[in-house]
């Protein structure tokens, strides 16, 4: 999704590939995959981001996701 990142493409690809492998291992359909990924994102936000920044970061993530789908 991000166009500019402090992380390497290799780091991102490795994590994404692992996550895809887990979803494939469980034969998760698209809706279940999206629910799981949404729960993961919510968990990361609520446990790792200060409450004062949580909503703004969630909105930025949502906007980035929408833009990624639009430009596909």
Swiss-Prot record:
InterPro entries: UPF0352, YejL_sf. Belongs to the UPF0352 family. This is UPF0352 protein HI_0840.
